[in-house]
């Protein structure tokens, strides 16, 4: 199995898009990318928009290699909608992305909040005549040759269900398992921790806790996440990649008490935290000095 994370905060955008290739099938997980409309009272800079376009093109290139596309939930950094927005630049990419693909997606009306339900409805109206097949994936397993794609029951997006629910995706080929936890925002809940341990993945790509919003996330939730991360590593031995919300925090490394790599580090690249350092970039500081 080959696992290639495509876009994330450590690569300069909001995303957790990932490509997985097995002998049987090419899988594109959560093919979305976006920019924060506002951070520190600042709009995205030209460098961020360049990265957005670069990552959109990369995701669409890997879509051409994919038979299956999965969507864990309906936030714009996890799927590509059929409308345009300055912080998404998605309209021209969506039709090409989903054309003739098998879509394994979060249920559009069950365990979902109102905002995402509306997005899912519009998405399905646009994609139904383009995709090869559409399956609602919640708590189901799909087989492609000897490859299994397993989806969890819906789990809360973060510390409660106000932001809806997400699916954890696990791809198994032979004895190797790759798990994409999507926006569980760290591991606050024991049932998510126990689900991960039961699956015994070898490699986990996790959307980390939003420590840049500690006033909302809370110290106790971060302590619980660190406790559960330690327990997961001890009981699975999995290699851990943590990115997404966590990498919106300049001091991300000191917030997590287990060994992990960012997506950029996993790929052998430098962390490029464009959103977290938007203020410094606005002040004219050199990117090579910030991230060199």
Swiss-Prot record:
Q: Which InterPro entries match?
A: RibonucZ/Hydroxyglut_hydro, UPF0173_UPF0282_UlaG_hydrolase, UPF0282_hydrls
Query: What one GO molecular function would you report for this record?
Result: hydrolase activity
Q: Where is the signal peptide?
A: none
The cross-references to SUPFAM superfamilies, in alphabetical order and at most eight, read: Metallo-hydrolase/oxidoreductase
- PANTHER family in the record, alphabetically? UPF0173 METAL-DEPENDENT HYDROLASE MJ1163-RELATED, UPF0282 PROTEIN MJ1629
Give the family, as the similarity comment puts it. Answer: Belongs to the UPF0282 family.
* Protein's recorded name: UPF0282 protein MJ1629
What is the species listed in this Swiss-Prot or TrEMBL entry? Methanocaldococcus jannaschii (strain ATCC 43067 / DSM 2661 / JAL-1 / JCM 10045 / NBRC 100440)
